[in-house]
Design a protein with these regions (language model features):
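Feature primarily recognizes SF3-like P-loop helicase cores of small DNA viruses
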Residues: 53-57, 67-88, 94-120, 124-335
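N-terminal accessory nucleic-acid engagement/regulatory domains that precede
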Residues: 2-76
Length: 335
């Protein structure tokens, strides 16, 4: 068998202008995804065997991972920019259009949690979002994102969209890296580990707000809630599984691109804070102004108390947000 004409390093230089490896996917110079990368590389004539291709891919990823580019925009965005607006095929309010706009742009370190009562249309809205992303999503919950092996199944997906949250025993360090697009080690099965930036948008759907640690201010800055608490009268049970036409989806994106995104996060601030404190033990025992009283009340309610320093931090935050009335406490102490 003849020897390879080029070293892997030389091949990396040759292909650096022809292909791009971005977060688990391969693209050509026209930003078109290469679905069958092994066949694509073999057809170029630079490789003798399939094993040469495998070695080159590992070398290319390791050589250029630190310079990894951002994903090109979804083609549906460009289509939507040039289409005429028509009435929406499904009623979407301003906040829902803002969420679609943000998820498509994904230019800030935020993940959305959709919560609310059953029968309010949550599943239908999540179904629309998945289809806008051409079903290029992975149904991973927060627990699975904390695991390096299940995390690998989400690499190369543009959207993480799960109907489960599962916020127990989280690796917050890993999650912060994921949500802030920092390099993270990916451990795919039957392949070498490599570093990549997790570039997916995140959208989770649950009936009840999860218990999240308010002392982790870094994570709190990255969370926005959207509540849907109004039940739909006479709902169509097939809507959460309906397959929308491509034309309808382009029109939805066109409407989302038209929405005013000025100071858009402030529109979700109140419901986000309400959801963050709803299951918090400090809020549930907010009438107790001393730690010892708070810890005792937690035991009576079957809640796990924070440590005293963390209790003080959370309590200060709840005072700042207006969920604890310090003036009322002072008045009661004076009586």
């Amino acid at each position: 068998m003849r020897s390879k004409k080029y070293t892997d390093r030389e091949l990396c230089e040759i292909f650096s202008g022809k292909i791009k490896f971005i977060c688990g996917k391969w693209f050509n110079q026209y930003n078109e995804e290469i679905k069958r990368i092994d066949s694509y590389l073999m057809r170029t004539g630079y490789f003798n065997t399939a094993n040469d291709v495998i070695k080159f891919k590992d070398t290319f990823i390791m050589a250029y991972g630190e310079f990894e580019l951002d994903w090109p925009d979804l083609p549906i965005i460009e289509e939507a920019k040039h289409c005429e607006l028509e009435p929406l095929c499904y009623p979407l309010n301003e906040k829902q259009l803002i969420i679609i706009n943000y998820l498509l742009r994904h230019d800030e370190e935020i993940f959305f949690i959709l919560t609310g009562v059953g029968g309010s249309g949550k599943s239908t809205f999540a179904n629309i979002i998945r289809q806008v992303f051409d079903n290029d999503y992975a149904p991973l919950d927060l627990q699975q994102l904390s695991d390096p092996y299940t995390l690998a199944t989400g690499v190369g997906r543009r959207l993480i969209c799960s109907d489960e949250l599962n916020s127990k025993d989280l690796d917050n360090g890993t999650l912060k890296k994921i949500f802030s697009n920092q390099p993270i080690t990916i451990n795919p099965k039957f392949a070498k580990p490599y570093e990549s930036r997790f570039q997916a948008a995140f959208f989770f759907n649950c009936n009840e707000p999860p218990k999240l640690d308010l002392t982790d201010t870094g994570m709190m800055r990255r969370i926005l809630y959207y509540e849907m608490n109004e039940k739909i009268a006479n709902p169509d049970p097939t809507l959460n599984r309906k397959v929308f036409s491509h034309k309808d989806l382009v029109n939805i994106v066109a409407h989302a691109l038209q929405v005013d995104m000025t100071d858009w996060k402030s529109k979700f601030e109140k419901e986000t804070r309400d959801c963050l404190v709803k299951n918090n033990s400090v809020y549930l025992c907010r009438e107790e102004y001393k730690y010892v009283f708070y810890a005792d009340r937690c035991k009576l309610k079957g809640l796990k108390p924070f440590s005293e320093p963390n209790w003080q931090r959370v309590r200060s935050l709840l005072i700042e947000w207006g969920y604890i009335n310090v003036q009322a406490e002072e008045n009661s102490l004076c009586k």
